[in-house]
């Protein structure tokens, strides 16, 4: 299984070479993925990757894993689970075109609940019954019926009218990722709980502390160490760092190179 998601981290601008006021804090997305095997109801963790960066940075990391044949697509049934973010699925279709794709079941359910609340009233029995029936139809491979039913709705309000259009378009866009019953019978996960757990353990626990604001470069270095710890490669990473440090001691940088930053890990 390969699952991808983003998590927000508190950051502030990198220090300027010129003196001035300190930049104000903001939030940036930490993009991440987790690769694992399924053994019945147990997850066997293989690796996690989390960094503040672009979608292309994440795609490059996945490409390196693919080229190293760490995901032997000819010997495993690769399945990808994620929410509806376009930056995720665009890269997945380029890198792993034969993998099974799953729209996170709980993310899909949230969209249906939001529409039901606007159309039938929040917390009403009618809203819950409609959501339950729609999810059951998705499990029974009746996604076309769900989409058609949404399009036939007579909006109860302007908000409902807007959500009817959005939800129908959303389900149509991800229609090939909605065969939840077939996927579950095949032993695949249909939720992205694995990456959400990794986001919490690797990112949130360390970066989201009271009063903590991180320079993106420092946050990424910390995330590399956190990933190494949970991937079981922390010892190798530190050994590599010590070797590089020894080389710098034996062969100190020239005057021209002395201003270059040291390797992060």
Q: What is the predicted role of each segment?
A:
Residues 1-265:
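Catalytic center-proximal scaffold of phosphoryl-transfer enzymes
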């Amino acid at each position: 299984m390969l699952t991808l998601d983003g998590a927000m981290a508190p950051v502030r601008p990198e220090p300027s070479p010129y003196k001035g006021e300190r930049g104000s804090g903001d939030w940036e997305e930490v993009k991440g993925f987790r690769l694992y095997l399924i053994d019945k109801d147990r997850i066997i963790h293989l690796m996690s990757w989390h960094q503040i960066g672009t979608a292309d940075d994440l795609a490059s990391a996945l490409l390196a894993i693919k080229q190293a044949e760490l995901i032997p697509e000819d010997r495993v049934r690769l399945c990808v689970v994620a929410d509806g973010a376009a930056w995720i699925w665009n890269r997945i279709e380029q890198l792993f075109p034969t993998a099974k794709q799953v729209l996170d079941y709980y993310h899909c359910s949230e969209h249906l609940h939001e529409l039901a609340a606007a159309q039938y009233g929040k917390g009403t029995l009618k809203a819950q019954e409609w959501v339950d029936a729609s999810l059951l139809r998705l499990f029974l491979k009746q996604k076309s019926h769900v989409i058609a039913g949404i399009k036939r709705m007579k909006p109860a309000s302007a908000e409902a009218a807007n959500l009817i259009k959005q939800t129908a378009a959303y389900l149509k866009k991800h229609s090939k990722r909605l065969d939840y019953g077939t996927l579950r019978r095949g032993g695949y996960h249909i939720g992205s709980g694995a990456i959400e757990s990794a986001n919490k353990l690797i990112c949130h626990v360390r970066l989201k502390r009271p009063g903590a604001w991180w320079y993106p470069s420092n946050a990424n270095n910390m995330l590399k160490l956190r990933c190494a710890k949970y991937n079981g490669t922390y010892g190798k990473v530190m050994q590599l760092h010590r070797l590089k440090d020894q080389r710098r001691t034996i062969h100190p940088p020239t005057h021209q190179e002395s201003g270059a930053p040291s390797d992060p890990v």
